[in-house]
Amino acid sequence: MDFSRIDLSPEDQAFYQETRAFIAEHVTDDVLRRDREFGENFDEQVHLALGKAGYLASDWKLESEGGFSPVRRRIFQLEIGRAHTPWYHWGTTSVVARLMQQFGEPELTDAVLPGVLSGEIRLCLGYTEPEGGSDVATCKTRAVRDGDTWIINGSKMFTSNAQNAKYVFLLTNTEPQGPKHKNLTMFLVPLDSPGIEIQGIRTLDGDRTNIVYYSDVRVDDLYRIGDVNGGWTVMRSALDSEHGIVDPDDHGLQNISAMSEHGRVMAEAVDKAAAWVTLQDPDGRRPLDDDSVKYRLGRSIARMEAAVSTPGMYGRVALAQTMRDVSSDLMDILGAASVLPTDTKDSAGDGAAEYLFRHALPTGIYGGTMEVFRNMIAEHALKLGRPDYPG
């Protein structure tokens, strides 16, 4: 891999400056404060501004379709991340829109895609069920055909951003007696349909997600994505992308690991801790003068660097595990003030370690638990076969 610095062309340099100015104008302190308070990872005005300026369309489209070049895509994504822009759910919308275009009816794509690219239409995922855990193929939400429509009943957990979305990419069971993975069908269900109830819940890290209930929800067959009982085929590409097991592009400008944006959160917490331990107390002593602090901070930095440099699904496990381990070390180093959250008087490092500690636990669950990913690595990468669970 070539690690040399990329020299930007005058045009790309201008794009870099324009993007930074745009983000500075729209991602204000008030936007970030609201995001911390409500945990939605979404701001409608910012999202609409990104759409109006053409950023969403350029990010979604391939370069051959008029989208960003690899260099501009990297510039855009890095600057969006560095500013803590609350747009995490754009990734979900982008992936679902691509699947809709690939597997859905052209009429549906023509109706939905323009709104996606303008920012007016957002999409969310309806996979996980209350009793299903990480195995989405155990789906019990039923879709029963009734002429040209389908009647849907069931419930889904962790449907993040449903409160801001127009449609949910919903996994249903259309043949309960059929073989696993061959009885699933996908729909793009309008969330304003009668019979849908969205109930917000707050997670440990302060984010909002949702339980969504479906009671005799009628959906036209137009909204079916892919073949009847062919839902697993539709889902596979989305899951592979989420899990980080797709082949990387050869330009080398994409994120190294899956969920690498969480590595940035860890890096900022480590940087703030490193600055805090250099401060003197009233007696002129610094935490950094303690050899154990030097050792533990140095170890945290080394582990963080290793985790963010680990590729693909391996990095997904490395990041989640390292966040859990490093956050505990940082809170020990910073002492009692480390339990005070961001924007609290006298918090250590502005609460970055406290947030990392809370954020680390669900990070090991998003998109599948660490145990699921370790099994995937063992089975698919190391060729060790399927796990054999006792009992």
Which stretches of residues belong to each language-model region?
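Amphipathic, small/basic residue-rich leader segments at the start of a protein or domain
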Residues: 1-91, 111, 115, 272, ...
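Internal helix-loop-helix
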Residues: 51-119, 160-167, 304, 308-315, ...
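A short core secondary-structure module
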Residues: 148, 153-199
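C-terminal helix-coil-helix/basic helical segment that borders enzyme active sites and/or dimer interfaces
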Residues: 31-37, 282, 294, 298-347
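Glycine-rich beta->alpha junctions and the first turn(s) of the following alpha-helix
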Residues: 4-8, 197-307, 363
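A short, Trp-centered hydrophobic/proline-enriched beta-strand micro-motif
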Residues: 119-127
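A structural signal for short hydrophobic beta-strand segments in well-ordered beta-sheet cores
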Residues: 141-144
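Glycine-rich phosphate/cofactor-binding loops in nucleotide/flavin-utilizing enzymes
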Residues: 2-5, 71, 75-76, 95, ...
